[in-house]
């Protein structure tokens, strides 16, 4: 079941927090920055992983990191990033990440940001949400919306 919840993603009680990341080692804005500020170990692992893999190797993959009893899933669905309004999310890579997440977290509850891949990454929410519905049917997924806008 997919449920939309208003509030801070990091206050979720789910087993897994999943969010989209770029393949450049930058964890500087959006949910990534909030996670970095909340638990610096997640960022350190992500940055280290980026330093030993090329963006081409990372795109479409998921890096799992456990910290303080929670699993963080970094979904590599952006080869690069920018603040210019362009689309940086690779929707096919995001689907691949979602499929990996479902397979590896089948018996766990999952929280993700509402409009994942769309706010900073520029993807179309209707398209991404349709993929979420398809991939995560029969799963417990929470989509956290920081504000109702």
Write out the residue ranges for each language-model feature:
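Macrodomain-like recognition of ADP-ribose-binding/processing modules
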Residues: 1-149
């Amino acid at each position: 079941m997919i449920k939309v919840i208003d509030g801070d993603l990091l206050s979720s009680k789910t087993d897994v927090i999943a969010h989209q990341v770029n393949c450049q080692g930058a964890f500087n804005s959006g949910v990534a920055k909030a996670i970095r500020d909340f638990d610096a170990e997640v960022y350190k692992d992500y940055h280290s992983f980026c330093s030993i893999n090329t963006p081409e190797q990372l795109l479409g993959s998921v890096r799992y990191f456990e910290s303080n009893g929670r699993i963080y899933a970094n979904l590599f669905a952006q080869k690069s990033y920018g603040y210019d309004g362009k689309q940086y999310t690779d929707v096919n890579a995001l689907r691949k990440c979602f499929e990996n997440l479902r397979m590896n977290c089948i018996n766990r509850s999952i929280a993700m940001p509402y409009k994942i891949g769309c706010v900073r990454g520029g993807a179309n929410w209707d398209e991404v949400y349709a993929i979420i519905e398809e991939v995560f049917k029969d799963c417990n997924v929470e989509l956290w919306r920081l504000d109702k806008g």
